[in-house]
UniProtKB/Swiss-Prot annotation:
Catalytic activity: a ubiquinone + n Na(+)(in) + NADH + H(+) = a ubiquinol + n Na(+)(out) + NAD(+)
Name of the protein in question: Na(+)-translocating NADH-quinone reductase subunit F
The species this protein was found in: Idiomarina loihiensis (strain ATCC BAA-735 / DSM 15497 / L2-TR)
Membrane spanning stretches: 4-24
Enzyme class of the recorded protein, top EC level: translocase
Cofactor: [2Fe-2S] cluster; FAD
NCBIfam families (alphabetical): nqrF
GO CC annotations, alphabetized: plasma membrane
Length: 408
C-alpha cells in the first residue's frame, strides 16, 4: 500500500513539475499584457489589443475593416497593409501575393501577421470609411439556374457610399443548411433534380466572410444587390464540400438578417474619353450592370460603350430588359449575347460560341484601333484568360485591361 501511495505521489510531483515548466516557458515565449498598434503615425488611431491574434482580426475588433475576400484564409491577397515595425518575418504563404520588392517595403497580408509585440503600420485612408451594417433580406430570387439576385435592405436612412465596380463583404455565422429547403424557381428544377443537388447539405462550424461585387449602381439607394452563383459539389461526387457562403446565401429568405461591411474595391472605371468594352459571363454580370448603369444613367457618358455577355443557354440570360432599355435610351451603347450551348426550345437566332470569339469576329477583327479601347471584364477564370490572351494578341496594353477576378 505504501508503494502505491509513493507511486501516486511521485507521479503527482512529476506532473506539477511539468506544468510549472510549461507555464514558465509560456511566460517567456508568449507575450503578456496589452499590445499597441500605431496606425499611420496617428496617436488618435492607435489601437490596443491582446497578443496572439492576427492583425486582420485585431483591426476588425477595433472597427477597422480591411478588405479580405477570402475571409482571412490567405488566398485572395487583398488584406494588404504596410508594417513599419513589429510583425516578424514575412511568411511563405504571403509571397504568392507579394513581390520581393513589395516585401522589402513592408507590405504584408494582415490575415497572416501574428500580433506579438507593439507594431507600427500604415493603412490607406479610405479604410477608415469602411463600416458594417445589419441588413434585412428583401428578396432572393433565381435569375439563372445557379444564380440568385440577392437584395438586402439597409437600415432606414443608411447608404453604402460605393463606386460602380465596388464590392462588399458579407458574414455568415456557423450554420447547417439543406439544399432541399432552398427556394428554387420551378423553371430551374430540371438541372437541380438531374444532378441530385437537392440532396446536398452544407454544415459550417465557423464564421465565414466572403466578398461580392454590387450589381446595383450608386443611385439605386437603400439596397445592396448581388448576383450569387452557388458553388455546388461536382455532380459525380456530392460528398465533397459545397460553397460555404453561397450555400448560406441561397438558404436566406425575405426578412432574414445579414451583416455586410464595405465599401471596398478597385475595379473602377477610368475617367478618360476612350471607348469602353465590357465583357462578362455568369455571375460576373454584377459589376457589369453596376458599371453600365452608372455610365449611362448617372454619368451620362458620351463615350462609345458596348457590352458582350456569354451564357450557356437562353435560360441563363438575365437583365435582358435592363440592357435593352439602356440601348434604347442611349445611341452610344449597344450590347450582345452569345450562347455557348443553345437549347432547341430557345429558338436562338443570335450569336453562338464563346464570347471572346464572338467579340473578335463581330467587332474587334475590323476595329481600327482596339489597343486604344478600355476593356473591363468579369467572368469565370477560363473566360477571363481567353479574353486577356485575345487582347494581348491585338496589342492591348495591360493598363487598358481591367479585371474583376472574382474566380481567380
Amino acid at each position: 500500500m505504501q508503494e502505491i501511495y509513493l507511486g501516486v505521489g511521485m507521479f503527482t510531483i512529476i506532473v506539477l513539475v511539468l506544468v510549472a515548466i510549461i507555464m514558465f516557458a509560456k511566460s517567456k515565449l508568449v507575450p503578456q499584457g496589452d499590445v499597441e498598434i500605431l496606425i499611420n503615425d496617428d496617436e488618435d488611431k492607435k489601437i490596443v489589443t491582446q497578443p496572439g491574434t492576427k492583425l486582420l482580426g485585431a483591426l476588425a475588433n477595433a472597427g477597422i475593416f480591411v478588405s479580405s475576400a477570402c475571409g482571412g484564409g490567405g488566398s485572395c491577397g487583398q488584406c494588404r497593409v504596410t508594417v513599419k515595425e513589429g510583425g516578424g518575418d514575412i511568411l511563405p504563404t504571403e509571397l504568392d501575393h507579394i513581390t520581393k520588392r513589395e516585401a522589402r517595403e513592408g507590405c504584408r497580408l494582415s490575415c497572416q501577421v501574428n500580433v506579438k509585440q507593439d507594431m507600427e503600420i500604415e493603412l490607406p485612408e479610405e479604410v477608415f470609411g469602411i463600416r458594417k451594417w445589419d441588413c434585412t433580406v428583401k428578396s432572393n430570387d433565381n435569375v439563372a439556374t445557379f444564380i440568385k439576385e440577392f437584395i438586402v435592405q439597409l437600415p432606414e436612412g443608411e447608404e453604402v457610399p460605393f463606386r460602380a465596380g465596388g464590392f462588399i463583404q458579407i458574414e455568415a455565422p456557423p450554420h447547417h443548411v439543406k439544399y432541399k429547403d432552398f427556394d428554387i424557381s420551378e423553371e430551374y428544377h430540371g438541372d437541380w433534380d438531374r444532378f441530385g443537388f437537392f440532396d446536398v447539405e452544407s454544415k459550417v462550424d465557423e464564421e465565414v466572410v466572403r466578398a461580392y461585387s454590387m450589381a446595383n449602381y450608386p443611385e439605386e439607394k437603400g439596397i445592396i444587390m448581388l448576383n450569387v452563383r452557388i458553388a455546388t459539389p461536382p455532380p459525380n461526387d456530392l460528398s465533397l464540400p459545397a460553397g460555404k457562403m453561397s450555400s448560406y446565401i441561397f438558404s436566406l429568405k425575405p426578412g432574414d438578417k445579414v451583416t455586410i461591411s464595405g465599401p471596398f474595391g478597385e475595379f473602377f472605371a477610368k475617367d478618360t474619353d476612350a471607348e469602353m468594352v465590357f465583357i462578362g459571363g455568369g455571375a460576373g454580370m454584377a459589376p457589369m450592370r453596376s458599371h453600365l448603369f452608372d455610365q449611362m444613367r448617372r454619368i451620362k457618358t458620351d463615350r462609345k460603350v458596348s457590352f458582350w455577355y456569354g451564357a450557356r443557354s437562353k435560360k441563363e440570360m438575365f437583365y435582358v430588359e435592363d440592357f435593352d432599355m439602356l440601348a434604347e435610351e442611349n445611341e452610344n451603347f449597344d450590347w450582345h449575347v452569345a450562347l455557348s450551348d443553345p437549347q432547341p426550345e430557345d429558338n436562338w437566332e443570335g450569336d453562338t460560341g464563346f464570347i471572346h470569339n464572338v467579340l473578335y469576329e463581330r467587332y474587334l477583327k475590323d476595329h481600327d484601333a482596339p489597343e486604344d479601347c478600355e476593356f473591363y471584364m468579369c467572368g469565370p477564370p477560363v473566360m477571363n484568360a481567353a479574353v486577356i490572351n485575345l487582347l494581348k494578341d491585338l496589342g492591348v496594353e495591360d493598363e487598358n485591361i481591367m479585371l474583376d477576378d472574382f474566380g481567380g
